[in-house]
Each structure stands twice: as C-alpha cells, then as structure tokens.
Curated annotation (Swiss-Prot):
In the reaction, the free carboxyl group of octanoic acid is attached via an amide linkage to the epsilon-amino group of a specific lysine residue of lipoyl domains of lipoate-dependent enzymes. Residues 31-206 form the BPL/LPL catalytic domain. Belongs to the LipB family. It comes from Pseudomonas fluorescens (strain SBW25). SUPFAM superfamilies: Class II aaRS and biotin synthetases. Pfam families: LplA-B_cat (PF21948). This is Octanoyltransferase. Substrate binds at R70, G71, G72, Q73, V74, T75, Y76, H77, S137, L138, G139, G150, L151, A152. Its EC number is 2.3.1.181. It catalyses: octanoyl-[ACP] + L-lysyl-[protein] = N(6)-octanoyl-L-lysyl-[protein] + holo-[ACP] + H(+). It is found in: Cytoplasm. One of its GO terms (biological process) is protein modification process.
Length: 215
C-alpha cells in the first residue's frame, strides 16, 4: 500500500453522478487499487440513508430527495458544505468501522480547533458537535472490506433547509457551521486543512492531488 493518499477536487457536482461513481469505484477496485478521497460541494439535496424513515422528511419542498445506500438517516447537502468521500480499503488499513468513524471525528475536531472552535463527538450519535449543535455529519457504507460515502462539514452555507427535516433522525436537532464561530473563512483553506487532518488520522505519510474525472 502506498504511503501517499490521493485526493480528487471535484468542485461543485450533482449528488447522484458522484454517488454512482463511488459505487463503481468500490465495486471495481482490485486489491492493488490505491485509496482515494473525493472532495466536493453539492447543489441542494436531501439524502436518506438505509435506516431513514419517511416521517423525518418534514417538508422537502423543491429540494430533491435521494434514497442512498449509506448508514444513517436523512441529511442535507448544499453549497458551502465541504463533503469528503472516503474510498478506503479498510482491511489493508487495519481499521474497524468504529475505529474509522472515531478517526473521522478526531480529524474534524482537530480541524475545528485550528480555527479556535471547541468541538466534540457524541458516543450515541456519530458526528461532531459545537455546544450541542451539529456541525459535521458522518455516514459510511462498507462493501467487500472497502468504505465509501464519508463526511460533510458545514462551512459557510444556508442552514435553513435542515429545518425541513429531522437531521439524522433527531427532531429539533440544532445545526451550526464554521462561519458562525470563526471569521473570516475561506472554503479552499478549510479544504486544505481537512486534507492534512485526513492524511494524519488515516496514518498516511503524504498526500497528492489526483487528476482526471470520476466517470
């Protein structure tokens, strides 16, 4: 396994093509395939996980709802939110699912600390929280020992659509974002800091930017 973790910077892309691409990547990767992390922003979309219940979709309105194959309940993605899809061979890395989730949470907590924001994880509700409000969501799927889906960090976005759902299945869960706690915020800088933290917490030595498309 390489000691270099590859990142793809996808910019802003619709959710479904990226989801289908990560499914293909996971289904077709061989034992020699290198791990990748895809960084992306999505146009407004609700995604409903495998445990999702219809009653948690309160008033989706004109925002599309996509039923997906990750764990967890419903969440929202939109512009100003940094999404990282972790396409990892967790068998080679030697991580259990709980260990991987803990590493993802630690990565986010340290990133937020670099902006002077104190955040914490909750043992019974995966994700990262600031003063009880959720700032980052996690959702994974493991197939053939490899992960896909990942994490979403609210950076500087319109949080109003979260009020149209029970985020992650919790009625009335308060949501927050980095720009509410630290200014000024540059999205590209947050992305760079996230990359560095993922390299550290996934036990890689270096990172590189991958070129080419995902389809």
């Amino acid at each position: 396994m390489s000691h270099v973790l590859g990142f793809r910077e996808l910019g802003r892309m619709d959710y479904e093509p990226v989801w289908h691409a990560m499914q293909r990547f996971t289904n077709e990767r061989g034992t020699s395939a290198e791990d990748e992390i895809w960084l992306v922003e999505h146009p407004p979309v609700f995604t409903q996980g495998q445990a999702g219940k219809a009653e948690h979709l309160l008033l989706p309105g004109d925002i599309p709802v996509v039923q997906v194959d990750r764990g967890g309940q419903v969440t929202y993605h939109g512009p100003g939110q940094l999404v990282a899809y972790l396409l990892l061979d967790v068998r080679k890395l030697g991580f259990g699912v709980r260990d991987l989730v803990s590493r993802m949470e630690a990565c986010l907590i340290e990133l937020l600390a670099s902006y002077g924001v104190t955040a914490a994880a909750k043992p019974d509700a995966p994700g990262v929280y600031v003063d009880g409000a959720k700032i980052a969501s996690l959702g994974l799927r493991i197939r053939h020992g490899c992960s896909f889906h990942g994490l979403a960090l609210n950076v500087d976005m319109d949080l109003a659509p979260f009020r149209r759902i029970n985020p992650c299945g919790y009625a009335g869960l308060a949501m927050t974002q980095l720009s509410d706690h630290a200014t000024p915020i540059k999205f590209a800088e947050v992305s760079a800091r996230l990359r560095a933290q993922l390299v550290k917490h996934l036990d890689y030595a270096e990172q590189t930017t991958l070129t080419g498309g995902i389809d």
